[in-house]
């Protein structure tokens, strides 16, 4: 009874996360994060490394990483934004920034697969469910070649 009670406590109320559309997953699997591929990526990688290391507090590191995520998105560098987001220490900030990346990626069919990358990094089933619904709906609207 105790085992069943523990299982129910942990699993009831958690939404079942719908899968991403298979076509979106297939396209996302062709994307790779390689911040060493170009000078801009190298600078972003270096900035992310500097922001996430050292003797600063977690809040300070998270603030620097959050700023880099926003900067990366402004530059159209979803790869760097995803890398920086998963390094955030605060779970709520991480989930929020990953959802921000997913929403930003969903604005354009060409960047939509980066939203799948962001959703994969999410740990909160509720946030991940919202992201999957958004990404799947947007994927269905995108023209196919």
Model region roles, listed by residue range:
Residues 2-145:
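Non-catalytic tandem-repeat scaffold regions and their flanking low-complexity/translocation tails
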